[in-house]
Amino acid sequence: GLLGTLGNLLNGLGL
């Protein structure tokens, strides 16, 4: 993802 610090789950999926 883009912001792994703010949302590891969401950003991890590419959201």
From Swiss-Prot:
Keyword field: Amidation, Amphibian defense peptide, Antibiotic, Antimicrobial, Immunity, Innate immunity, Secreted
Expressed in which tissues: Expressed by the skin glands.
Biological process, per Gene Ontology: defense response to bacterium; innate immune response
Protein name: Frenatin-2
Post-translational modification Leucine amide, affected residues: L15
Role of this protein: Antimicrobial peptide with selective activity. Is only active against Micrococcus luteus (MIMC=50 ug/ml) and not against Bacillus cereus, Escherichia coli, Leuconostoc mesenteroides, Micrococcus luteus, Pastewella haemolytica, Staphylococcus aureus, Streptococcus faecalis and Streptococcus uberis.
Similarity section: Belongs to the frog skin active peptide (FSAP) family. Frenatin subfamily.
Compartment(s) of residence: Secreted
UniProt source species: Nyctimystes infrafrenatus
Primary localization: secreted
Entry GO CC: extracellular region
